[in-house]
Regions:
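Class I S-adenosyl-L-methionine-dependent methyltransferase module
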Residues: 52, 56-61, 73, 78-79, ...
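Phosphate/oxyanion-binding active-site loops and adjacent basic polyanion-contact surfaces
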Residues: 122-133, 227-230, 250-255, 284
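Short His-Asn-centered micro-motif
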Residues: 129, 154, 250-253, 272-274, ...
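Short catalytic/ligand-binding loop motif for oxyanion handling, primarily in non-cytosolic enzymes
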Residues: 158-163, 279-281, 313-315
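A short SAM/SAH-binding and catalytic strip from SAM-dependent methyltransferases
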Residues: 268-283
């Protein structure tokens, strides 16, 4: 236990925070992103980086926040970080350890720059997850006979995942920057179309809007700079979003808002969440599950599709995840509906690069 100079001497667990830096990337992503992997390792060894993370409110003590702030400083003109990250954006080869050392030098020399941004929250809501969510929504809607739905996205950020019916999904990159690319590991799986979405609702405590310059800069910063394709996709989808229907955006705690939204009308309602429930306290997760169970009992056409790390799902009274994880660090997709108990549907890369389908509600 150490004292945090950035938080009035509040104690923090150095080893716990160091391990968060070391393990924030999955083994698969560490192989794909050598510069970011080296940076995460260097952050774990930096006393200043530990103190900065320790100064963040508990539910946001995620190393992705520090990574995003560094990227944000680069995007907004920092004289040293800008060129460093620019090399990654352009896909130029860099020496991972040298990149990490240079970034750490800035962090330790100018910690106040990062300190001023600790109020922010990481809200990526990766658009490529829509490629997987679209498969799950289509499969469940086909099984349950739903031709029109309301879609509610919990932790919506900028709202990309409210449009699974508007995106192009491919199984390999064909040069279309706006297309989502995901590989299905399940032989013979055939996608069913996403039903007509009549109402789209995004819930988030910190809504981001595609027309606000700083919101766009911050969400760009939440992406990983070595993924040039992902950055191009974000820009292309922002442009396409101008032509999409304007969703309903509601700011606030989803636990407080969900009652109204799932009873808005009698259209079959699908609630989705992806990598957001980790930011709920244990008490909030229990309250969320109880609230959803109440509405499952009250109406016949409510569906909840959850895409989270299995350790989060364990706190939601979901069945124990099967052991057939295709790759370490995968997210588990669990489907719950008014007619069926929570059931394991499949696995996915956290950013939707691949997915597998194991089961689903059976009519």
């Amino acid at each position: 236990m150490a004292l945090n100079l950035f938080d009035r001497g509040a104690p923090f667990d150095e080893e716990e925070l160091a391990n968060r830096y070391r393990h924030i990337l999955s083994p698969e992503d560490r192989d794909r992103l050598p510069a970011y992997a080296a940076l995460c390792d260097a952050l774990a060894e930096s006393r200043t980086a530990l103190e900065l993370l320790g100064a963040v409110q508990a539910r946001q003590q995620n190393p992705t926040l520090i990574l995003a702030i560094l990227h944000y400083l680069a995007l907004t003109g920092h004289l040293v970080l800008g060129p460093l990250y620019g090399e990654l954006h352009e896909g130029h080869p860099v020496t991972p350890e040298a990149f990490a050392r240079s970034v750490i030098e800035v962090l330790e020399a100018e910690p106040a720059l990062l300190r001023r941004q600790l109020w922010r929250s990481t809200q990526t809501n990766e658009p490529n997850r829509s490629a997987v969510l679209a498969a799950a929504i289509g499969d469940v809607a086909r099984t349950l006979g739903h031709s029109q739905i309301t879609l509610i996205d919990v932790g919506t950020s900028m709202g990309f995942n409210l449009f699974p019916d508007h995106v192009t999904v491919l199984d390999r990159d064909q040069g279309d920057d706006a297309a989502l690319v995901t590989e299905c590991f399940t032989p013979g799986f055939v996608r069913s179309p996403v039903p007509f979405i009549g109402r789209r609702v995004g819930l988030d405590q910190n809504l981001l809007h595609p027309t606000k310059t700083d919101d766009v800069a911050w969400l760009t910063a939440c992406l990983w700079p070595e993924e040039s394709r992902r950055l191009r996709r974000f820009t292309a989808l922002l442009e396409q979003m101008k032509q999409w229907p304007e969703p309903v955006r509601v700011a606030g705690n989803a636990v407080d808002l969900i009652d109204y939204e799932v009873t808005f009308d009698d259209t079959p309602t699908y609630v989705i969440n992806s990598w957001v429930l980790a930011y709920f306290s244990l008490e909030e997760r229990a309250q969320w599950r109880n609230t959803m169970d109440y509405h499952f009992a009250e109406r016949e056409d409510l569906v909840w599709i959850s895409m989270e790390h299995p350790s989060i799902n364990d706190t939601l009274r979901f069945p124990e995840a099967p052991k057939n994880v295709p790759r370490p660090g995968a997210s588990e997709i669990v489907v719950t509906s008014s007619f069926y108990p929570s059931i394991h549907w499949g696995w996915s890369h956290p950013h939707g690069h691949w997915f597998s389908v194991d089961s689903g509600p059976k009519a």
